Amino acid sequence: MSRIVVLGAGESGAGAAVLAKVKGFDTFVSDMSAIKDKYKELLDKYGIAWEEGHHTEELILNADEVVKSPGIPNDAPLIMKLKEKGTPIISEIEFAGRYTDAKMVCITGSNGKTTTTSLIYHIFKSAGLNVGLAGNIGNSLALQVATEQHDYYVIELSSFQLDNMYNFRANIAVLMNITPDHLDRYDHCMQKYVDAKFRLTQKQTDRKSTRLNSSHQIIS
């Protein structure tokens, strides 16, 4: 049985852990901070082992794959140790995308993405479509994939959520705008932040499935 370790037990991490457990993985969750009671209850409900307040390296470094919550930087010491071992490190969105055939409409941008995501979701819902709202708003995508059956997902994605995404492909990708933000996470390099945002389009095979704001200088 393959071992999945989830780092971080917030909305993203707890959801990823439930999906991993449902799919038959040996699952362990570790959070350096205190875990909220509602997430402890969720993990306990599915019989998932967890720890809080510290990372026990011997329980983490033996993972076959790690699902990293978006709040953990890629240069954190534990992440660097996992990289040195060659352990694959992916995002919750990447993990969840493996287990659903639902159509994905994904929105990112420095400003306005929550409003746009909510509007698209409302349009889908009003049209009678079976749609879930996920990502930076709504419930964890992984948790919905594990416990619900949606035909469509409208997903708001921050740059942090786009990090550690490699094979995930949106059916429709919307990139609204890019302005300087979170640059401390990207070595104060604007290009690295831009690259993170453009991860949303990395697997697009049809130009018609990508919506770029061509009036925005950085994107155009």
Describe the function of each predicted region.
Residues K208, L212-S220:
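Single conserved hydrophobic/aromatic residue that forms the stacking wall/gate
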Residues M1-S91, F95:
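N-terminal leader/targeting and accessory segments in enzymes
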Residues E41, K45, R98, L143, ...:
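Charged/polar, solvent-exposed surface patches and flexible loops
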Residues E58-L61, P70-K208:
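Phosphate-binding loop of NTP-binding sites
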Residues H54-H55, H182-L183, H216:
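Histidine-centered active-site/metal-ligand motif
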Residues L19, K23, Y99, R199-L200, ...:
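Short alpha-helical scaffold segments that flank and stabilize functional sites
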